[in-house]
Amino acid sequence: MSKSARLRTVWWTLHRWIGIGLAILLVPIAVSGALLVWHDHLDALIHPGRYAVSGGAFVPPSAYVASAATAIGAGVQPAAVRFPESDGWPVIVMARGARVEGGPPPRIVNVYLDPPTARVLDVVDFRSSLIGFLHRFHENLTIPEYSGRAIVGWAGVGMLILSLTGIWLWWPRSGAFLPGLRWGRAAHTTTNLHHLIGFWISIPLAVVSFTGIYLGFPQTARDVMSSIAPMTPQGQRPGFGSIARDARQTPDSALDAALASQPGTRAAAIFLPTASANTSERDRARGGEGAREQNPRASGPVWRVQLRKAPTSEIVTVMVDDRSGAVERQRDPLAGDRAAQWMRWIHEGSHSGPVWQFVVFLTGVCPLVFAVTGVIMWWRGRRLRRSVAGNRAIGSGGLQAAE
Protein backbone atom coordinates (compact mmCIF):
# COMPACT_ATOMS: atom_id res chain seq x y z
CA MET A 1 0.00 0.00 0.00
CA SER A 2 1.37 3.40 -0.98
CA LYS A 3 1.94 6.19 1.53
CA SER A 4 -0.98 8.24 0.13
CA ALA A 5 -3.26 5.20 0.34
CA ARG A 6 -2.26 4.59 3.96
CA LEU A 7 -2.88 8.25 4.79
CA ARG A 8 -6.27 8.11 3.10
CA THR A 9 -7.13 5.04 5.17
CA VAL A 10 -6.20 6.91 8.35
CA TRP A 11 -8.37 9.92 7.40
CA TRP A 12 -11.22 7.64 6.37
CA THR A 13 -11.12 5.74 9.68
CA LEU A 14 -10.97 8.98 11.66
CA HIS A 15 -13.79 10.55 9.63
CA ARG A 16 -16.03 7.50 9.90
CA TRP A 17 -15.74 6.85 13.62
CA ILE A 18 -15.85 10.49 14.73
CA GLY A 19 -18.96 10.92 12.59
CA ILE A 20 -20.69 7.80 13.90
CA GLY A 21 -19.53 8.26 17.48
CA LEU A 22 -20.50 11.93 17.81
CA ALA A 23 -23.57 12.03 15.55
CA ILE A 24 -25.98 11.78 18.48
CA LEU A 25 -24.36 14.90 19.96
CA LEU A 26 -23.38 16.87 16.84
CA VAL A 27 -26.75 16.70 15.08
CA PRO A 28 -28.91 18.27 17.85
CA ILE A 29 -26.26 20.92 18.55
CA ALA A 30 -26.11 21.80 14.85
CA VAL A 31 -29.89 21.80 14.34
CA SER A 32 -30.42 24.00 17.40
CA GLY A 33 -27.88 26.43 15.93
CA ALA A 34 -29.74 26.46 12.62
CA LEU A 35 -33.00 27.33 14.39
CA LEU A 36 -31.31 30.14 16.31
CA VAL A 37 -30.16 31.88 13.11
CA TRP A 38 -33.71 33.24 12.73
CA HIS A 39 -34.83 32.94 16.35
CA ASP A 40 -37.07 36.03 16.29
CA HIS A 41 -38.92 34.86 13.19
CA LEU A 42 -39.28 31.36 14.65
CA ASP A 43 -40.68 32.79 17.87
CA ALA A 44 -43.10 35.01 15.92
CA LEU A 45 -44.27 31.97 13.95
CA ILE A 46 -44.96 29.99 17.13
CA HIS A 47 -46.32 32.89 19.23
CA PRO A 48 -47.86 35.47 16.88
CA GLY A 49 -49.60 37.25 19.76
CA ARG A 50 -46.26 38.49 21.10
CA TYR A 51 -45.66 40.31 17.85
CA ALA A 52 -49.16 41.67 17.17
CA VAL A 53 -48.09 45.33 17.21
CA SER A 54 -50.38 48.17 16.19
CA GLY A 55 -47.77 50.43 14.58
CA GLY A 56 -44.20 51.65 14.51
CA ALA A 57 -44.40 54.84 16.60
CA PHE A 58 -42.81 54.98 20.05
CA VAL A 59 -43.78 56.45 23.41
CA PRO A 60 -41.21 57.60 26.01
CA PRO A 61 -39.17 54.66 27.36
CA SER A 62 -40.38 55.29 30.92
CA ALA A 63 -43.84 54.18 29.76
CA TYR A 64 -42.44 50.81 28.68
CA VAL A 65 -40.58 50.40 31.97
CA ALA A 66 -43.67 51.26 34.02
CA SER A 67 -45.91 48.96 32.00
CA ALA A 68 -43.43 46.09 32.30
CA ALA A 69 -42.95 46.62 36.05
CA THR A 70 -46.70 46.34 36.57
CA ALA A 71 -46.89 43.15 34.50
CA ILE A 72 -44.01 41.25 36.12
CA GLY A 73 -44.81 41.96 39.76
CA ALA A 74 -42.32 41.43 42.59
CA GLY A 75 -39.10 39.45 42.44
CA VAL A 76 -37.71 40.84 39.19
CA GLN A 77 -36.76 44.36 38.12
CA PRO A 78 -36.74 45.99 34.68
CA ALA A 79 -33.11 46.20 33.57
CA ALA A 80 -33.17 47.18 29.90
CA VAL A 81 -35.44 48.42 27.13
CA ARG A 82 -34.76 47.12 23.61
CA PHE A 83 -36.23 48.91 20.62
CA PRO A 84 -36.94 47.05 17.35
CA GLU A 85 -34.58 47.57 14.44
CA SER A 86 -37.50 47.88 12.00
CA ASP A 87 -41.25 48.44 12.04
CA GLY A 88 -43.54 45.53 12.80
CA TRP A 89 -41.68 44.26 15.86
CA PRO A 90 -42.37 44.84 19.58
CA VAL A 91 -40.40 46.73 22.18
CA ILE A 92 -38.92 44.29 24.71
CA VAL A 93 -38.22 45.12 28.33
CA MET A 94 -35.77 42.68 29.90
CA ALA A 95 -36.21 42.19 33.64
CA ARG A 96 -33.90 40.30 35.99
CA GLY A 97 -34.21 38.64 39.35
CA ALA A 98 -31.66 39.09 42.11
CA ARG A 99 -28.32 37.35 41.70
CA VAL A 100 -27.50 34.94 44.54
CA GLU A 101 -23.81 34.33 45.23
CA GLY A 102 -23.04 30.71 44.37
CA GLY A 103 -26.62 30.11 43.25
CA PRO A 104 -28.23 29.57 39.85
CA PRO A 105 -28.25 32.32 37.21
CA PRO A 106 -30.78 35.07 37.95
CA ARG A 107 -34.21 34.74 36.45
CA ILE A 108 -34.70 36.63 33.17
CA VAL A 109 -38.17 37.77 32.09
CA ASN A 110 -38.91 39.41 28.75
CA VAL A 111 -41.96 41.66 28.50
CA TYR A 112 -43.21 42.21 24.93
CA LEU A 113 -44.87 45.60 24.44
CA ASP A 114 -46.78 47.33 21.67
CA PRO A 115 -44.55 50.27 20.58
CA PRO A 116 -47.26 52.96 20.12
CA THR A 117 -49.24 52.16 23.28
CA ALA A 118 -46.87 50.36 25.71
CA ARG A 119 -49.58 47.71 26.03
CA VAL A 120 -48.26 44.37 27.29
CA LEU A 121 -48.43 41.69 24.60
CA ASP A 122 -46.84 38.86 26.57
CA VAL A 123 -44.64 38.11 29.58
CA VAL A 124 -42.13 35.31 29.04
CA ASP A 125 -39.66 33.61 31.34
CA PHE A 126 -36.79 33.45 28.87
CA ARG A 127 -35.05 30.32 30.12
CA SER A 128 -38.25 28.26 30.09
CA SER A 129 -39.22 29.37 26.56
CA LEU A 130 -38.37 27.38 23.43
CA ILE A 131 -35.89 30.01 22.24
CA GLY A 132 -34.32 30.15 25.68
CA PHE A 133 -33.99 26.36 25.73
CA LEU A 134 -32.39 26.36 22.27
CA HIS A 135 -29.89 28.99 23.42
CA ARG A 136 -29.00 27.05 26.56
CA PHE A 137 -28.78 23.72 24.74
CA HIS A 138 -26.60 25.10 21.96
CA GLU A 139 -24.34 26.83 24.46
CA ASN A 140 -23.97 24.24 27.23
CA LEU A 141 -26.44 21.35 26.61
CA THR A 142 -28.48 22.84 29.53
CA ILE A 143 -25.91 21.32 31.93
CA PRO A 144 -23.49 24.17 32.73
CA GLU A 145 -22.73 22.59 36.09
CA TYR A 146 -21.34 19.50 34.32
CA SER A 147 -18.98 21.31 31.93
CA GLY A 148 -21.67 21.45 29.25
CA ARG A 149 -19.97 24.36 27.51
CA ALA A 150 -16.68 22.47 27.27
CA ILE A 151 -18.51 19.41 25.89
CA VAL A 152 -20.01 21.59 23.16
CA GLY A 153 -16.53 22.99 22.50
CA TRP A 154 -15.04 19.52 22.06
CA ALA A 155 -17.97 18.58 19.82
CA GLY A 156 -16.92 21.57 17.71
CA VAL A 157 -13.41 20.11 17.52
CA GLY A 158 -14.94 16.89 16.20
CA MET A 159 -16.97 18.80 13.62
CA LEU A 160 -13.88 20.71 12.49
CA ILE A 161 -11.98 17.43 12.01
CA LEU A 162 -14.91 15.97 10.06
CA SER A 163 -15.11 18.97 7.72
CA LEU A 164 -11.35 19.01 7.02
CA THR A 165 -10.95 15.24 6.59
CA GLY A 166 -14.09 15.30 4.45
CA ILE A 167 -12.38 17.62 1.96
CA TRP A 168 -9.41 15.25 1.76
CA LEU A 169 -11.63 12.19 1.24
CA TRP A 170 -13.80 13.98 -1.32
CA TRP A 171 -10.83 14.88 -3.52
CA PRO A 172 -10.65 12.47 -6.49
CA ARG A 173 -7.72 10.07 -6.28
CA SER A 174 -6.67 11.10 -9.78
CA GLY A 175 -6.06 14.61 -8.43
CA ALA A 176 -8.44 16.18 -10.96
CA PHE A 177 -10.79 18.72 -9.36
CA LEU A 178 -13.71 19.02 -11.80
CA PRO A 179 -14.56 15.30 -11.97
CA GLY A 180 -15.19 15.46 -8.24
CA LEU A 181 -18.12 17.81 -8.80
CA ARG A 182 -20.06 15.25 -10.83
CA TRP A 183 -23.24 13.85 -9.34
CA GLY A 184 -22.61 10.31 -10.57
CA ARG A 185 -19.31 9.64 -8.82
CA ALA A 186 -20.94 6.76 -6.95
CA ALA A 187 -23.71 4.31 -7.71
CA HIS A 188 -25.92 5.29 -4.77
CA THR A 189 -27.85 8.52 -4.21
CA THR A 190 -26.90 8.67 -0.53
CA THR A 191 -23.19 8.55 -1.38
CA ASN A 192 -23.53 11.25 -4.03
CA LEU A 193 -25.47 13.44 -1.58
CA HIS A 194 -22.80 12.98 1.08
CA HIS A 195 -19.97 13.80 -1.33
CA LEU A 196 -21.52 16.74 -3.16
CA ILE A 197 -23.19 18.52 -0.24
CA GLY A 198 -20.12 17.82 1.87
CA PHE A 199 -17.82 19.54 -0.60
CA TRP A 200 -19.87 22.72 -0.93
CA ILE A 201 -20.50 23.16 2.78
CA SER A 202 -17.15 21.92 4.13
CA ILE A 203 -15.34 25.28 4.29
CA PRO A 204 -18.26 27.22 5.87
CA LEU A 205 -18.77 24.31 8.27
CA ALA A 206 -15.09 24.45 9.24
CA VAL A 207 -15.38 28.21 9.85
CA VAL A 208 -18.51 27.87 11.99
CA SER A 209 -16.92 24.96 13.88
CA PHE A 210 -13.74 26.94 14.55
CA THR A 211 -15.67 29.95 15.87
CA GLY A 212 -17.78 27.58 17.96
CA ILE A 213 -14.61 26.15 19.51
CA TYR A 214 -13.55 29.71 20.34
CA LEU A 215 -16.86 30.35 22.09
CA GLY A 216 -16.84 26.95 23.79
CA PHE A 217 -13.62 27.68 25.67
CA PRO A 218 -14.04 31.40 26.49
CA GLN A 219 -11.22 31.83 29.00
CA THR A 220 -8.66 29.91 26.94
CA ALA A 221 -9.78 31.75 23.82
CA ARG A 222 -9.44 35.09 25.58
CA ASP A 223 -5.96 34.22 26.81
CA VAL A 224 -4.87 33.32 23.28
CA MET A 225 -6.52 36.38 21.72
CA SER A 226 -5.05 38.79 24.28
CA SER A 227 -1.58 37.38 23.59
CA ILE A 228 -1.76 38.51 19.96
CA ALA A 229 -4.03 41.58 20.14
CA PRO A 230 -4.91 44.11 22.88
CA MET A 231 -8.15 43.49 24.78
CA THR A 232 -10.01 45.40 27.47
CA PRO A 233 -9.35 43.96 30.94
CA GLN A 234 -12.07 41.64 32.16
CA GLY A 235 -14.65 43.07 34.51
CA GLN A 236 -18.23 42.57 35.48
CA ARG A 237 -20.52 42.14 32.51
CA PRO A 238 -22.06 45.56 31.69
CA GLY A 239 -25.60 45.96 32.95
CA PHE A 240 -25.52 42.86 35.17
CA GLY A 241 -25.00 44.50 38.55
CA SER A 242 -27.77 45.41 40.97
CA ILE A 243 -30.16 48.02 39.59
CA ALA A 244 -29.66 51.39 41.27
CA ARG A 245 -32.68 52.33 43.38
CA ASP A 246 -31.92 56.03 43.80
CA ALA A 247 -31.32 57.06 40.18
CA ARG A 248 -31.67 60.79 39.52
CA GLN A 249 -32.11 60.52 35.78
CA THR A 250 -35.09 58.85 34.16
CA PRO A 251 -35.05 56.59 31.09
CA ASP A 252 -36.49 59.52 29.13
CA SER A 253 -33.84 62.04 30.18
CA ALA A 254 -31.01 59.53 29.71
CA LEU A 255 -32.19 58.73 26.18
CA ASP A 256 -32.69 62.40 25.31
CA ALA A 257 -29.15 63.22 26.47
CA ALA A 258 -27.71 60.33 24.48
CA LEU A 259 -29.61 61.24 21.30
CA ALA A 260 -28.57 64.90 21.62
CA SER A 261 -24.91 63.85 21.77
CA GLN A 262 -25.16 61.71 18.63
CA PRO A 263 -27.22 63.48 15.94
CA GLY A 264 -28.71 61.28 13.25
CA THR A 265 -29.14 58.24 15.48
CA ARG A 266 -32.14 56.47 16.96
CA ALA A 267 -32.66 54.39 20.07
CA ALA A 268 -31.56 50.75 20.06
CA ALA A 269 -31.48 49.94 23.79
CA ILE A 270 -31.36 51.56 27.22
CA PHE A 271 -29.76 49.75 30.16
CA LEU A 272 -30.88 51.03 33.53
CA PRO A 273 -28.05 52.15 35.83
CA THR A 274 -26.38 49.56 38.00
CA ALA A 275 -25.02 50.27 41.45
CA SER A 276 -22.05 47.88 41.35
CA ALA A 277 -20.93 47.75 37.71
CA ASN A 278 -20.48 51.47 37.13
CA THR A 279 -16.68 51.49 37.56
CA SER A 280 -16.05 48.79 34.97
CA GLU A 281 -18.51 50.44 32.62
CA ARG A 282 -16.76 53.80 32.92
CA ASP A 283 -13.40 52.13 32.37
CA ARG A 284 -14.76 50.39 29.30
CA ALA A 285 -16.08 53.68 27.95
CA ARG A 286 -12.75 55.44 28.50
CA GLY A 287 -10.65 52.57 27.21
CA GLY A 288 -8.98 51.20 30.33
CA GLU A 289 -8.64 51.13 34.07
CA GLY A 290 -6.35 54.15 34.11
CA ALA A 291 -9.31 56.47 33.69
CA ARG A 292 -10.33 55.73 37.26
CA GLU A 293 -7.05 57.08 38.55
CA GLN A 294 -7.30 60.19 36.37
CA ASN A 295 -10.78 60.97 37.64
CA PRO A 296 -11.26 59.40 41.08
CA ARG A 297 -14.52 61.27 41.63
CA ALA A 298 -16.08 59.51 38.65
CA SER A 299 -18.40 57.23 40.59
CA GLY A 300 -22.07 56.52 40.95
CA PRO A 301 -24.55 54.88 38.61
CA VAL A 302 -24.35 55.31 34.84
CA TRP A 303 -26.90 54.67 32.12
CA ARG A 304 -25.72 52.72 29.09
CA VAL A 305 -27.54 53.71 25.92
CA GLN A 306 -27.10 52.02 22.54
CA LEU A 307 -27.99 54.04 19.45
CA ARG A 308 -28.31 53.05 15.79
CA LYS A 309 -26.69 55.13 13.11
CA ALA A 310 -28.65 55.75 9.93
CA PRO A 311 -28.60 54.21 7.39
CA THR A 312 -26.04 51.53 8.35
CA SER A 313 -27.66 50.54 11.69
CA GLU A 314 -24.19 50.52 13.24
CA ILE A 315 -24.43 50.54 17.04
CA VAL A 316 -22.94 53.43 19.02
CA THR A 317 -22.80 53.12 22.82
CA VAL A 318 -22.80 56.14 25.13
CA MET A 319 -22.71 56.43 28.91
CA VAL A 320 -24.90 58.96 30.71
CA ASP A 321 -23.78 59.93 34.20
CA ASP A 322 -26.76 59.60 36.51
CA ARG A 323 -25.68 62.46 38.78
CA SER A 324 -24.49 65.09 36.34
CA GLY A 325 -26.21 64.02 33.12
CA ALA A 326 -22.85 64.17 31.33
CA VAL A 327 -22.59 62.00 28.23
CA GLU A 328 -19.50 60.07 27.21
CA ARG A 329 -19.24 57.96 24.08
CA GLN A 330 -17.78 54.51 24.54
CA ARG A 331 -14.51 54.18 22.71
CA ASP A 332 -14.21 51.86 19.74
CA PRO A 333 -13.32 48.29 20.76
CA LEU A 334 -9.67 47.33 20.88
CA ALA A 335 -8.40 45.02 18.14
CA GLY A 336 -8.74 41.89 20.27
CA ASP A 337 -12.23 42.84 21.44
CA ARG A 338 -13.30 43.48 17.85
CA ALA A 339 -11.88 40.13 16.71
CA ALA A 340 -13.69 38.33 19.55
CA GLN A 341 -16.89 40.14 18.61
CA TRP A 342 -16.54 39.02 15.01
CA MET A 343 -15.98 35.44 16.15
CA ARG A 344 -19.45 35.49 17.71
CA TRP A 345 -21.04 37.32 14.79
CA ILE A 346 -19.60 34.86 12.27
CA HIS A 347 -20.80 31.92 14.33
CA GLU A 348 -24.30 33.36 14.76
CA GLY A 349 -24.65 34.60 11.20
CA SER A 350 -25.39 38.09 12.49
CA HIS A 351 -24.02 41.43 11.24
CA SER A 352 -22.87 39.69 8.05
CA GLY A 353 -25.78 40.00 5.63
CA PRO A 354 -28.48 37.53 4.54
CA VAL A 355 -26.17 35.40 2.37
CA TRP A 356 -23.85 34.40 5.21
CA GLN A 357 -26.86 34.05 7.49
CA PHE A 358 -28.33 31.49 5.09
CA VAL A 359 -24.98 29.70 4.82
CA VAL A 360 -24.77 29.44 8.63
CA PHE A 361 -28.30 28.02 8.62
CA LEU A 362 -27.17 25.37 6.12
CA THR A 363 -24.18 24.45 8.30
CA GLY A 364 -26.71 23.60 11.00
CA VAL A 365 -28.95 21.53 8.74
CA CYS A 366 -26.32 19.64 6.71
CA PRO A 367 -24.87 17.60 9.63
CA LEU A 368 -28.24 15.86 9.88
CA VAL A 369 -27.96 14.92 6.18
CA PHE A 370 -24.37 13.78 6.71
CA ALA A 371 -25.33 11.66 9.71
CA VAL A 372 -28.13 9.85 7.86
CA THR A 373 -26.23 9.33 4.61
CA GLY A 374 -23.00 8.50 6.46
CA VAL A 375 -24.62 5.78 8.57
CA ILE A 376 -26.25 4.31 5.44
CA MET A 377 -22.89 4.32 3.65
CA TRP A 378 -21.20 2.66 6.63
CA TRP A 379 -23.93 0.02 6.95
CA ARG A 380 -23.86 -0.70 3.23
CA GLY A 381 -20.07 -1.09 3.31
CA ARG A 382 -20.32 -3.34 6.35
CA ARG A 383 -22.79 -5.63 4.59
CA LEU A 384 -20.61 -5.69 1.49
CA ARG A 385 -17.54 -6.67 3.50
CA ARG A 386 -19.49 -9.44 5.21
CA SER A 387 -20.74 -10.68 1.85
CA VAL A 388 -17.24 -10.70 0.39
CA ALA A 389 -15.89 -12.50 3.45
CA GLY A 390 -18.68 -15.06 3.20
CA ASN A 391 -18.01 -15.69 -0.47
CA ARG A 392 -14.33 -16.18 0.26
CA ALA A 393 -15.17 -18.66 2.99
CA ILE A 394 -17.46 -20.58 0.64
CA GLY A 395 -14.81 -20.58 -2.07
CA SER A 396 -12.18 -21.82 0.36
CA GLY A 397 -14.49 -24.59 1.54
CA GLY A 398 -15.16 -25.68 -2.03
CA LEU A 399 -11.45 -25.92 -2.78
CA GLN A 400 -10.86 -28.05 0.31
CA ALA A 401 -13.69 -30.41 -0.69
CA ALA A 402 -12.25 -30.74 -4.19
CA GLU A 403 -8.89 -31.67 -2.72
Please place each PLM-identified region on the residue numbering.
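Conserved histidines in hydrophobic membrane contexts and catalytic metal-binding motifs
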Residues: 1-403
